[in-house]
């Protein structure tokens, strides 16, 4: 925090940033509570084209299907201001609306085959963490799947994403009832009727509460603007083996403090992945003709970064591969997060799956950011979710699965400000800065001219009566040389050749050349002095 910066300071009422605070009535507060435009939310799914081969331990082959385009609306409600702590408390709601017009030719009715998120997810986690329960869970899974014959799910795309896949929990057998009860308590399924549940990727989250947040408003310290204080009444997480990994670092990603520099990271904390991610400065950029800063994200390599060992299951031996993050502690399922198509990740991950084609343009994470105002003008947050698959030991159906990280889908959440918003940024910030700069230089120029003119006027007033003694030659003619070119106006010498009184007016060129010394010159002319023309030339 640079609270000692004279530009930033701690004055909450400083005019240059009072509209950026999350104080009631400010423009920023209204936009923070409800973004006035939807974010673009795109989903890409990976269809496994050879599930039978994979069930026998073969190499998976996938084909990407997408994008399925959604509007994502973010709204914060039930807001409470705490003046003493300078915090804002709110509940977040995310709403996704399918846009078939922007998804064409895709409709959501396409059939897709993927590793079964529910079956494999549950069995793999039990095998990893609670192996003693494997017989009970395996028996219950066989009953509700009636019976279990494969580790893959073939279903309609929109059922998988939002509408839901039916899970039969009508059996009264103990293992089946225990399994269904566990799935419900974990929030993996939602009730459909008395005997069935529904499972989907996003259905449970659509239009529902996404947690109770507390963030700083930035009134007392603008550099704290938007910083997460607590989530669901917890001031830190409790899922990693290390305090640093459990901290909330940064904002909720919809707002950032102003006056950042290229040395700062853009930090944001996300409950969807239970960790903070920091984007680093990547260079200068332009957006809509405006100068910007370009920030990029790197997931790093936890194995070779001791400060990130708290994200490892058993460091340094069991850590997520380079360019990935282990989401199992957060999601309760063997899910690995990465950039799409394993871009910027361990090459071994890409080699283990056919059909992936990573490239920077489509798969990197970026932000075009205006540092002074803290405004992201164009951004794409991209994350791929893959399942960490391995053989289920002693299982007749799932015992031959390969050990592989198999992509399920990836999501892109982004927005690019249109002309309405970039023009507002241009006229309120950039042109404002240019106007301020122009005013500053205009003030300097006018001040300089004023000094010169003022000096000239003072010079003129104080030199109205100067006694001049012309230097005569032996024959009575005026002296030539340096003094010959000097203009003297007033009375002519008297008949006795004595002195006369005449004002001396310097040229504009002389004034400009000597403007810095005008106060000294003027001081020397407080009263009339008897000087010769030659002396005046030498003096001025």
Curated annotation (Swiss-Prot):
Its main location: membrane. Keywords: Cell membrane, Disulfide bond, Glycoprotein, Membrane, Olfaction, Receptor, Sensory transduction, Transmembrane, Transmembrane helix. Pfam families: CD36 (PF01130). It is a multi-pass membrane protein. GO terms for molecular function: scavenger receptor activity. The keyword Glycoprotein applies. This is Sensory neuron membrane protein 1. It comes from Aedes aegypti (Yellowfever mosquito).
